Amino acid sequence: MEQRDYYELLEVSRNASDAEIKKAYRRLAMKYHPDRNPGDTSAEEKFKEIQKAYNILSDKQKRAAYDQFGHAGVDPSMGGGPGGFGGFGGFGDVFEDIFENIFSGGRGHGRQSRGQRGADLQFNVQLTLEEAAIGKEVEITVPRHGTCTVCEGSGAKKGTSPKTCETCQGMGQVRIQQGFFSIQQTCPTCHGEGKIISDPCASCHGQGRVRESKKINVKIPAGVDNGDRVRLSGEGEAGVHGGGSGDLYVQISLKKHAIFERHENDLHCEVPISFATAALGGSIEVPTLEGRVTLKIPAETQTGKVFRLRSKGMKSVRGYGQGDLLCKVVVETPVNLSREQKELLNKLQDSLENAKGTHSPKTSSWFAGVKKFFEDMKF
C-alpha cells in the first residue's frame, strides 16, 4: 500500500518550521480525533496517519532521514536509508545495535542522544465530585526544565550558534566499511549530536534548558473520574540541545463525597424514610448534583428498594450521555419512643399479627421456610 507524503498529511510545506508543524498537527489531531468522530473509521485512520507523520517530522534526525531517503529512511521494513541493513528487515536493527556498541564505546545509538526529547511529567489534581460533574479550569505550578531563554534552546552562547559537525556532516553518525558489512556508528567528534558547541551558553551550561516553575492553566472536562488523565502536549521537560519537549499528564483524583458513591457514570445514595412513609406511601426530597428533586414513594415500600432517577448522574467525559442516580431507601426504626407511642405500636403489632396478608412477600416466604424447617427437624 502506497504511503502518503508526511508533509502533505500535515498540510505543510517541506521547509516548514518546527512551530508550524506542531501547530498543524494540533489542528488536524483535534479535527480527526476519535472522540470527536465516534464510529467514523476513516477519521480514525486519518488520525493515526497524522500521529505517525508528526512523530517523524517533529524529530530532527528522523525528519532529516525522511527528507533524504523518504519513507525508506524511517521505516526499517522498507530497506535502504541511513539505518542500513534494509534488505534484512527487522534483523538490520539487531546487527546495527551490536556493531554500534562495539565501535562507539558502548554509547548506543547516536540517533537517541542527538537532540534528546524531554521527559514526560505527571501532576496530580484533586477535585470534588461537584467540580468533576461540571468541569473546572485550574492553575497549576509545575517544576520542570524549561527551554533556556538566553540561547533559545540551542545551548550556544548568545550571538553564536552551534556549528555543523564536519566529521558526520550533521547526521550524528558515520559509516565504516568492515568487509561485507557497512557499519553505522555514533560520530566520535560530536557524540551523536550532529553539531559542535564551541562556546556554550553560560546560563544553561550548553544544555539548552534550565530549571523553572511554570504556571499552567488546565481545562478539566466534565465527567472525569479517578485515574483519568489530561494530556498537555509539549508542557513536560524541555529537550536537551533543541530536542522536543515531553508532555505533561494531569492525573485526576476525586475526594470522597458525603452522600454519593460513584460507579462509572452512575451515582448511588441511601435515602432514609419513616416507617409510616414506607407503609402508606408519600413524597420525599432527595439531593442531586443539580439540586433537589421530589421522589414519590409508593405504599408498602420495603427497605432496600432502589429507585432510579434518569440522567441525574455524571456526564460522560466523552461529551455525550449521562448516568443515573440510584436511590436506595432505608426504612428507619423509630427511637426514643414515648409511652403513648409504644402503646400505639403494640396495638398495631397485635392487629397485624391477627390479620392475614399483612406481611410482605419476603417476610411471608421467610416464615414459611422456618415453619418447614422445624417440621422437617421434628422439634
Swiss-Prot record:
One of its GO terms (cellular component) is cytoplasm. Binds 2 Zn(2+) ions per monomer. GO terms for molecular function: ATP binding; heat shock protein binding; unfolded protein binding; zinc ion binding. Keywords: Chaperone, Cytoplasm, DNA replication, Metal-binding, Repeat, Stress response, Zinc, Zinc-finger. The keyword Chaperone applies. InterPro entries: DnaJ (IPR012724), DnaJ_C (IPR002939), DnaJ_domain (IPR001623), DnaJ_domain_CS (IPR018253), HSP40/DnaJ_pept-bd (IPR008971), HSP_DnaJ_Cys-rich_dom (IPR001305), HSP_DnaJ_Cys-rich_dom_sf (IPR036410), J_dom_sf (IPR036869). CXXCXGXG motif repeats lie at residues 148-155, 165-172, 187-194, 201-208. The keyword Zinc applies. Zn(2+) 2 binds at C165, C168, C187, C190. A zinc finger (CR-type) spans 135-213. Zn(2+) 1 binds at C148, C151, C201, C204. Transmembrane segments: none annotated. It comes from the Bacteria. The J domain is necessary and sufficient to stimulate DnaK ATPase activity. Zinc center 1 plays an important role in the autonomous, DnaK-independent chaperone activity of DnaJ. Zinc center 2 is essential for interaction with DnaK and for DnaJ activity. PANTHER family: CHAPERONE PROTEIN DNAJ (PTHR43096:SF48), DNAJ HOMOLOG 1, MITOCHONDRIAL-RELATED (PTHR43096). This is Chaperone protein DnaJ. It comes from Legionella pneumophila subsp. pneumophila (strain Philadelphia 1 / ATCC 33152 / DSM 7513). The gene is dnaJ.
